Curated annotation (Swiss-Prot):
This is Extracellular protein ARB_04177. Keywords: Secreted. Signal peptide: none annotated. GO terms for biological process: lipid metabolic process. Disulfide bonds: none annotated. It comes from Arthroderma benhamiae (strain ATCC MYA-4681 / CBS 112371) (Trichophyton mentagrophytes). It is found in: Secreted. SUPFAM superfamilies: PLC-like phosphodiesterases. GO terms for cellular component: extracellular region. GO terms for molecular function: phosphoric diester hydrolase activity. The keyword Secreted applies. It comes from the Eukaryota. Gene3D superfamilies: Phosphatidylinositol (PI) phosphodiesterase (3.20.20.190).
Length: 245
């Protein structure tokens, strides 16, 4: 994960921004950033699946007046077609619903498993609106929603972690769910005091690191997510192996 020190007064201090619960052990090896095509070759070599996210541009589009958002979205698909990667192995992601609609119109075979990274429930009003419009969203062509996991969980009257109204509405509408990002929050005994984003809807029930398995269990067994993105694989892999998922 990228990190920075917002209180820095020098370049060195600015770069020394990795949270203490993460490590810079491997940062000194000067790893080389791969292109998307290079990433595809590595993943394909191991016979794995692909989960590319079409990142939001940091420049105005169309870039240089020529390269449009639609061309950007199409280029991603074109590279999978050129490499003859089966659509069944590709799980596209985007925070822009327009990207999902574009793929539905122009690349339906690759769009079937596309995930709309839904940031609407990051606010209470957004969550209410999203929950109320699930049926319309499904009718518009959205098959899989992927919000941060706080959006899929809430606490009941007994302080138990249960599926949120958003999660219940999505499943009722026939929309698949995935979620993110586990293992990004640091020590769980501090998430309530720190106002951690990911645990914001259930922080009152989180006491220590072992509670991560309660979260995973509710997501897997009660919410029924199809997958969980995690910054570290150990927790989800251990759980999946225990329950033969």
């Amino acid at each position: 994960m990228d990190g920075f020190n917002p209180r820095a007064t020098t370049v060195a201090e600015y770069m020394d921004g990795t949270p203490k619960f993460r490590t810079d052990l491997y940062a000194s090896t000067c790893g080389q950033l791969l292109s998307h095509k290079e990433y595809m070759r590595v993943v394909d070599m191991y016979g794995l699946k692909f989960t590319p996210e079409l990142k939001a541009p940091e420049v105005p589009m169309p870039f240089m007046g020529k390269y449009s958002q639609e061309q950007y979205a199409q280029q991603l698909i074109d590279e999978y077609r050129a490499a003859r990667i089966s659509p069944d192995r590709v799980f596209l992601q985007s925070f822009s619903i327009d990207d999902i609609y574009f793929w539905n119109r122009h690349d339906a075979d690759y769009a079937r498993q596309a995930m709309f990274l839904d940031s609407r429930p990051d606010t209470p009003e957004g969550a209410r609106q999203a929950t109320a419009t699930m049926a319309q969203l499904k009718q518009s062509g959205i098959r899989t929603l992927s919000p941060a996991f706080h959006a899929l969980l809430k606490l009941d009257a007994g302080n138990n972690i249960v599926p949120s109204d958003y999660a219940v509405a999505a499943k009722k509408a026939g929309i698949k769910l995935t979620t993110w990002s586990l293992e990004r929050s640091g020590p769980l005994n501090k998430v309530r005091a720190s106002g951690d984003f990911y645990y914001s809807s259930i922080a009152a029930a989180i006491k220590d690191d072992g509670d991560i398995y309660r979260v995973v269990d509710v997501l897997a067994q009660k919410v029924g997510v199809a997958g969980i993105f995690s910054d570290w694989p150990a927790t989800v892999s251990f759980y999946a192996n225990c329950f033969n998922l």
